């Protein structure tokens, strides 16, 4: 009994224990994952021991902040400043942050931003669809590029598009063919990069059918950037994401440092990707190792260096900018200080870009997410949403073993993006039901139904793709932090794909209210999951799906 309890509580125990030691916050997550492997029970189907509930008694310490805390920051924000040890911290005014609510608003904003762009358009997505709405976007790009050439004083507009190679090359008409006219007409201004995972190579690449090769790994980042304005989202560039596929979107207006960071990030991934040519061929940047023909280790090292150089240089720039702005030379006159204050008002909101690229040994998002879940205190509320409910073991352990209340929003089978698909893909919603039921059963076996609640999103003729979380501190009716971007909190997001999201920390009541309304709008269309949910005829999972799910759950 004692051995079983230790194995069950192990992952959280080691995170708590390491939290008492000085050092990087990521060490807790790292040791927790090591404990996951060492403490795994050979009989994976056996229920976790109720001793898991003892894990919260090991109270964590707030991760050490190596940078000096800013006296201008509210005390409630201090607890998250450790994130800047890992990534750049961008302080902005909350008036520059707008939360979008609908696919139509997202689509219209993108078109409007493209039309007025003067310097740069940077778009990273899984793929670009081939329908009339997607063509509208391409036409907007073409028109804006044309105007930039005809202007009396050419603006030097540059367009950079990053997509996934496998998804963007599927079928005779695809993302590549949609973008070829732009490349052919504006070869000096347009760049199209197609990321190919280094894990799909050799015999595996030859044998896996086109429809399934994307399961090995993808470019999954979604960022849409226009001059100094940035949209972070989980939405792709496809018609359903512009009409009836619910996602999340945040618009950062006039944020040049953030725009520069994501431009450099997309450029970095683009540099290690295949470059689309005007004749629909692809080639690598000169001197770069090929992702699936070259040495895998050498390619991953080069990619790691390229991306980490962007992250680290931006982090240093922001630290210097922060010091110059808010910790200036005491010999400055009062007039100089006032003038500096006029140029850059004290921020009330902080943006942290969280990058996850496990193929390149970059796991910042994983570290930050695990630490946030570990630090969620008794009385805090975490609203976590994912279109594909398939949490990693580490995330599940933290949800079940920590003290915060959890409201987890997921897609009902009818609004799952694979619902009604042909062939094997049509069984994927049933596999998610099976995973959901297993998790719900575990919650019940631990007596956690009041603290951890599942809710299913449903909306007629819509699908659900929203992901992220909102954190409400104990005693607060509004969130002070949200995560928004591309990760789904599943195995793929952590281990296979390239992901990016941002943590938004704010003390602005107006922005907190925006985030709260966004959360309420999504959860308003949800129903609470109970044991009766799984008794419905539509929730009966075939035996073969139950048997196959453990084997394939790490691929979707």
Curated annotation (Swiss-Prot):
Location of the active site: 220, 222, 227
Annotated GO biological process: cardiolipin biosynthetic process
GO cellular component: mitochondrion
Localization annotation: Mitochondrion
Annotated GO MF terms: ATP binding; CDP-diacylglycerol-glycerol-3-phosphate 3-phosphatidyltransferase activity
UniProt keyword list: ATP-binding, Lipid biosynthesis, Lipid metabolism, Mitochondrion, Nucleotide-binding, Phospholipid biosynthesis, Phospholipid metabolism, Phosphoprotein, Repeat, Transferase, Transit peptide
Chain sites annotated for binding ATP: 124-131
Pathway: Phospholipid metabolism; phosphatidylglycerol biosynthesis; phosphatidylglycerol from CDP-diacylglycerol: step 1/2
Predominant cellular place of this UniProt entry's protein: mitochondrion
Modified residues (Phosphoserine): 49
EC assignment: 2.7.8.5
InterPro entries, alphabetized: PGS1, PLipase_D/transphosphatidylase
Disulfide bridge partners, by residue number: none
Span of the transit peptide along the chain: 1-28
Coiled-coil residue spans: none
CDD domains per record: PLDc_PGS1_euk_1, PLDc_PGS1_euk_2
Record-annotated PLD phosphodiesterase domain positions: 215-241, 419-457
Domain of life: Eukaryota
Enzymatic reactions: a CDP-1,2-diacyl-sn-glycerol + sn-glycerol 3-phosphate = a 1,2-diacyl-sn-glycero-3-phospho-(1'-sn-glycero-3'-phosphate) + CMP + H(+)
Activity regulation comment: Activated by calcium and magnesium and inhibited by other bivalent cations.
Family of this protein: Belongs to the CDP-alcohol phosphatidyltransferase class-II family.
Physiological role: Functions in the biosynthesis of the anionic phospholipids phosphatidylglycerol and cardiolipin.
Protein's name in the database: CDP-diacylglycerol--glycerol-3-phosphate 3-phosphatidyltransferase, mitochondrial
Gene: PGS1
């Amino acid at each position: 009994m004692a051995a079983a309890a230790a194995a069950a509580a192990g992952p959280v125990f080691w995170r708590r224990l390491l939290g008492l030691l000085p050092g990087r916050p990521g060490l807790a997550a790292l040791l927790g994952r090591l404990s996951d492997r060492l403490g795994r029970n050979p009989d994976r189907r056996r229920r976790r021991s109720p001793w898991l509930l003892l894990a919260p008694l090991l109270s964590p310490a707030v991760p050490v902040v190596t940078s000096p805390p800013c006296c201008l920051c509210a005390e409630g924000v201090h607890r998250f400043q450790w994130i800047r040890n890992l990534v750049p911290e961008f302080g902005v005014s909350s008036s520059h942050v707008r939360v979008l609510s609908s696919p139509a608003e997202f689509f219209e904003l993108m078109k409007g931003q493209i039309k007025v762009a003067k310097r740069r358009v940077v778009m990273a997505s899984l793929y670009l669809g081939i329908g009339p709405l997607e063509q509208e976007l391409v036409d907007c790009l073409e028109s804006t590029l044309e105007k930039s050439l005809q202007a009396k004083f050419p603006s030097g507009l540059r367009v950079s598009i990053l997509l996934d190679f496998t998804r963007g090359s599927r079928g005779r008409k695809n993302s590549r063919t949609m973008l070829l006219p732009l490349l052919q007409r504006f070869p000096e201004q347009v760049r199209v990069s197609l990321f190919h995972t280094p894990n799909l190579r050799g015999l595996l690449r030859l044998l896996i059918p086109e429809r399934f090769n994307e399961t090995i790994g993808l470019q999954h980042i979604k960022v849409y950037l226009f001059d100094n304005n940035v949209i972070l989202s989980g939405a792709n560039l496809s018609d359903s994401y512009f009409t009836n596929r619910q996602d999340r979107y945040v618009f950062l207006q006039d944020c040049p440092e953030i725009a520069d960071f994501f431009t450099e990030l997309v450029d970095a991934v683009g540099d290690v990707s295949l470059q689309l040519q005007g004749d629909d061929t692809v080639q690598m940047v000169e001197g770069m190792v090929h992702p699936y023909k070259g040495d895998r280790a050498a390619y991953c090292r080069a990619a790691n260096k390229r991306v980490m150089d962007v992250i680290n240089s931006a982090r240093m720039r922001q630290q210097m900018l922060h010091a110059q702005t808010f910790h200036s030379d005491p010999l400055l006159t009062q007039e100089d200080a006032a003038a500096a204050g006029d140029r850059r008002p004290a921020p009330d909101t902080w943006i942290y870009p969280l990058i996850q690229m496990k193929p390149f040994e970059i796991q910042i998002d994983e570290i930050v997410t695990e630490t946030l879940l570990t630090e969620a205190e008794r009385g805090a509320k975490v609203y976590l949403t994912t279109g594909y409910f398939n949490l990693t073991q580490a995330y599940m352990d933290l949800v079940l073993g920590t003290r915060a209340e959890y409201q987890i929003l997921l897609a009902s089978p009818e609004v799952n993006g694979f619902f009604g698909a042909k062939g094997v893909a049509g069984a994927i919603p049933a596999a998610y039901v099976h995973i959901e039921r297993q998790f719900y059963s575990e919650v019940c076996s631990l007596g956690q139904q009041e603290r951890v609640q599942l809710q299913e999103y449903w909306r007629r003729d819509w699908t659900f793709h929203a992901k992220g979380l909102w954190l409400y501190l104990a005693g607060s009716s509004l969130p002070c932090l949200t995560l928004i971007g591309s990760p789904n909190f599943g195995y793929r997001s952590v281990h296979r794909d390239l992901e990016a999201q941002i943590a938004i920390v704010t003390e602005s009541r107006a922005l907190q209210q925006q985030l709260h309304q966004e959360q309420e709008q999504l959860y308003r269309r949800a129903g609470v999951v109970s044991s009766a949910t799984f008794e419905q005829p539509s929730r009966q999972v075939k035996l073969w799906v139950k048997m196959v799910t453990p084997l394939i759950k790490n691929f979707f």
